[in-house]
Amino acid sequence: MDEDGLPLMGSGIDLTKVPAIQQKRTVAFLNQFVVHTVQFLNRFSTVCEEKLADLSLRIQQIETTLNILDAKLSSIPGLDDVTVEVSPLNVTSVTNGAHPEATSEQPQQNSTQDSGLQESEVSAENILTVAKDPRYARYLKMVQVGVPVMAIRNKMISEGLDPDLLERPDAPVPDGESEKTVEESSDSESSFSD
């Protein structure tokens, strides 16, 4: 034995003289374990089911709200054929503000920009910009009205349009689309001029 009174080699108990474990007690312990485990799993599944039901309800509410918003937007008269005019002065002031370190070269740049601006105005008449395109103009109008931008971007993606063009209304319409729109607009104008 060591200083704590424990045997050094084995337990020192003759196992042939130890009584057997009572079976009723073992069965009671197993039953208690099974009952507690089943109760825990039932509570867990109930909580999960409630949370899933709450999420499902919230998703349905969001879907309903989105449908109502879509219906309200489609009921606004004139939203389909709205064009937004962007003045070229805003564009030049933005470009001048972007280069504050080049103040000594500004007079030369202004004269260059004025001539470049006149050339771009001539070419702008031939190029269809995003602001003048009726497909994009209605989305730009939605932004001005105050519709959430993410909802507009999702709607544009669902219709196959580029949502990044919302931030660049003076950009030209992507290739292939401008020719179609020019033909469609000329067809629609000629149909009204009998």
Swiss-Prot record:
Pfam families: CCDC53. PANTHER family: PROTEIN AD-016-RELATED, WASH COMPLEX SUBUNIT 3. Its main location: other. Residues 103-121 have a biased composition (Polar residues). Residues 93-121, 159-194 are annotated as: Disordered. Acts as a component of the WASH core complex that functions as a nucleation-promoting factor (NPF) at the surface of endosomes, where it recruits and activates the Arp2/3 complex to induce actin polymerization, playing a key role in the fission of tubules that serve as transport intermediates during endosome sorting. GO terms for cellular component: early endosome membrane; WASH complex. Residues 46-74 form a coiled coil. It is found in: Early endosome. One of its GO terms (biological process) is protein transport. Keywords: Acetylation, Coiled coil, Endosome, Protein transport, Transport. This is WASH complex subunit 3. Belongs to the CCDC53 family. Component of the WASH core complex also described as WASH regulatory complex (SHRC) composed of WASH (WASHC1, WASH2P or WASH3P), WASHC2 (WASHC2A or WASHC2C), WASHC3, WASHC4 and WASHC5. The WASH core complex associates via WASHC2 with the F-actin-capping protein dimer (formed by CAPZA1, CAPZA2 or CAPZA3 and CAPZB) in a transient or substoichiometric manner which was initially described as WASH complex. The modification N-acetylmethionine is found at M1.
